[in-house]
């Protein structure tokens, strides 16, 4: 089978909930990163075999949002596109599918990634289709129902984090310390310009005057301390330890990579940023969905023939501090190699885009450090994990 390589990788800066990107639909965010991939490589858009993008909150987004993004990006109408939903793992599963297509010879060039605008997720009214003859009607928040609610146990994702905190004996103090460190690392990375090369600026229309460029993650909070986080009330259980401060946030953004067969990249004279060494998915108990990266990581490492100790860098999505700490405890990885520029607790978690966002951040940090082996992994609502390893030979 053919080696699959990444020749370009980019993301938008992550917008806060109801923040700078709130009015820009997910397909437009996706289109922006696709255009940037083509600009960076000089690739003729007609050479793209398919576009595969994750998006979780598709209600009200129109037919096949990935197709919308592809057309808006200027790809020819003959280039097909697919939207996939694997909840938080969608953006990374898109790379799995793209790599599979290339490895088996079905494609040579794939755009893969994810897009999400949580700010625009609509409220829906169940039952209205068949008529509301009398009485009150109920509005359902599609963002919570389709993105943040466990369909098996009928509770919020935050309860799954509480379950892990209880199972692993994780204290509120440990979780707050983890969250504060994530914020501090992210602020240091932003101030040091470490995200600059991976971010595609977005032009945000204004009511008056020219559009404003948006190129800096706006979720991280400078000056966050453990003491400040300790003042927050539990968000999901009265006697719980998971708060808004030690959990990821609601966000908007997009990310994408350009995948090619190694032979195609060589023929086009494009430099290879990294090779996809392996990828894997796994299922776990939905009640402790956050532990999903453990089995997914072990499977991916086994496929690559690597040990955990060989990894130079790891990007593990921080859905919750409790979840991240539980995964770290199970795998026993070196925390100094994990999310070195902060994670989703600070940077944000636009759910359909996050899988590719962590991959893009991993890749650019590997380039910056000349790292050879890296891992991207995420937990997934409903009880799954997803992982992918990168090699820079």
Swiss-Prot record:
GO terms for biological process: fatty acid metabolic process. The keyword rRNA processing does not apply. GO terms for cellular component: cytoplasm. The active site is at residues 88, 349, 379. It is an enzyme of class 2 (transferase). InterPro entries: Thiolase, Thiolase-like, Thiolase_acyl_enz_int_AS, Thiolase_AS, Thiolase_C, Thiolase_CS, Thiolase_N. Pathway: Metabolic intermediate biosynthesis; (R)-mevalonate biosynthesis; (R)-mevalonate from acetyl-CoA: step 1/3. SUPFAM superfamilies: Thiolase-like. It is found in: Cytoplasm. Keywords: Acyltransferase, Cytoplasm, Fatty acid metabolism, Lipid metabolism, Transferase. The keyword Transferase applies. It catalyses: 2 acetyl-CoA = acetoacetyl-CoA + CoA. Its EC number is 2.3.1.9. GO terms for molecular function: acetyl-CoA C-acetyltransferase activity. Belongs to the thiolase-like superfamily. Thiolase family. This is Acetyl-CoA acetyltransferase. It comes from Pseudomonas aeruginosa (strain ATCC 15692 / DSM 22644 / CIP 104116 / JCM 14847 / LMG 12228 / 1C / PRS 101 / PAO1).
């Amino acid at each position: 089978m053919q080696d699959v390589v990444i020749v370009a990788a980019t993301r938008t800066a992550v917008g806060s909930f109801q923040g700078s990107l709130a009015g820009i639909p997910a397909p437009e965010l996706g289109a922006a990163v696709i255009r940037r991939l083509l600009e960076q490589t000089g690739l003729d858009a007609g050479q793209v075999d398919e576009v595969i993008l994750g998006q979780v909150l598709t209600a009200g987004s129109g037919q096949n949002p990935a197709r919308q993004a592809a057309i808006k990006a200027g790809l020819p109408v003959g280039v097909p596109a697919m939207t996939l939903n694997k909840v938080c793992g969608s953006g990374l599963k898109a790379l799995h599918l793209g790599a599979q297509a290339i490895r088996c010879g079905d494609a040579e060039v794939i755009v893969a990634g994810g897009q999400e605008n949580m700010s625009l997720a609509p409220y829906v009214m169940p039952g209205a289709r068949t008529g509301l003859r009398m009485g009150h009607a109920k509005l359902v928040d599609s963002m919570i129902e389709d993105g943040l609610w466990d369909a098996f146990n009928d509770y919020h994702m935050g309860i799954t984090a509480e379950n892990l905190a209880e199972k692993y004996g994780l204290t509120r103090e440990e979780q707050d310390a983890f969250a504060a460190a994530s914020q501090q690392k992210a602020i240091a990375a932003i101030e040091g310009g470490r995200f600059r090369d991976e971010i595609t600026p977005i032009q945000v229309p204004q009511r008056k005057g020219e559009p404003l460029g948006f190129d800096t993650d706006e979720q991280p909070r400078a000056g966050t301390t453990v003491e400040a986080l300790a003042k927050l009330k539990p968000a999901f259980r009265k006697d719980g330890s998971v708060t808004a401060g030690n959990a990821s946030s609601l966000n908007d953004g997009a990310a994408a990579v350009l995948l090619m067969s190694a032979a195609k990249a060589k023929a086009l004279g494009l430099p290879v940023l990294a090779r996809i060494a392996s990828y894997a998915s796994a299922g776990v108990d939905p009640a402790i969905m956050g532990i999903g990266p453990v089995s997914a990581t072990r499977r991916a490492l086994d496929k690559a023939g690597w040990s955990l100790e060989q990894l130079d860098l790891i990007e593990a999505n921080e859905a919750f501090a409790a979840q991240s700490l539980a995964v770290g405890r199970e795998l026993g990885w070196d925390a100094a190699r994990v999310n070195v520029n902060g994670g989703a607790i600070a940077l944000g978690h636009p759910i359909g885009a996050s899988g590719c966002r962590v991959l893009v951040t991993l890749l650019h940090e590997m380039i910056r450090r000349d790292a050879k082996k890296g891992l991207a992994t995420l937990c997934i609502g409903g009880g799954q994990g997803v992982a992918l390893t990168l090699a820079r030979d």
